[in-house]
């Protein structure tokens, strides 16, 4: 099967968030499973020079951008047995950051149109074009309007994946005239609430639509989660499905991870205790093996559940024998709160400002319990990494958390969960974990089940292959 995977970022070339992790892992797994999956991304100025040195020039052409044509250079490279294509235009992409520019709508309208224009030049006729988030949402729109009836482009199916429905590519209608270039007779495809909405256009015109977890696919049909797109998604519910993301189980492997204080496995967990002791020492926490250590690695923003933590952590620290560490940065109100808590509970609570990947791995491996009380969570990777390292997650049953963490009350459980977005419910779930850790044998079995959880990309990739095959049957 021939798949063109379109994304605005992909590791190791360019990345600013979770999409880069997905685009850097899923296509490679698909290739290992025998699929011809190729990736296309912008040629950003931020791509490291050593990676640019591996690129080869193919050709250049012009791309329609509303009423004008813009230069497009096309490059390719091989990386980890996958073919990458790079769309080049220095005016659009040679900038210090990937996003946040005044002309992002124009930049990614150009990118979306260039993806379709490049296909004859690379002599690659994909069976499926897989688009991701609003930055490539115009690809199925442009295909439907301008390319589907051209002989070379016949019978190409499209899949549009929503990684976070909050970011929809919503702009005023002047953007259509200057950047997007949809005929006036067809603007209803992109219209929502009087504005131009790129994600809405993709939902309407793509062959299929997916999200990054089954529960999130169900949730975004509800007004509470949809950010206004529930009517569109309910109208086209038949094309919507959810596939849970995976993690790189080769990188996140407690048996071989060189960044851990000591390696361990599900069959020999003795090294995990040393990871905890060394982490406590590094963070100036009391070195007590018998005191449960609760960890968080997160952005400090409200939708990650930080308002619940702010309401309930002080009471937990006062009434329970526990330690707490959090690594992250974000809203100042939460940063100030954790600085206050660190001063109030010296030796028991540590706030590590910023994000240090090496320290994050040490928290995943050294903590006993991992807290993730999100208000919304399309998929989430942190809970799956914690499971991989045998650190028991306490999560709210929402989105991908609900699909990957199952309460220990069930025989197959691998963590502790709560449903309502309430401080008392979160506190009870944490207390249940603190009570559970006192049962050494039961906790060891829970850790074993956690480490046995299959959150690999192999499983997710097979689900995507099944979805691709099903999509090819659609008219």
Question: Where on the chain are the PLM-derived regions?
Answer:
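Catalytic cores of nucleotide-sugar-dependent glycosyltransferases that transfer UDP/GDP/TDP-activated
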Residues: 1-475
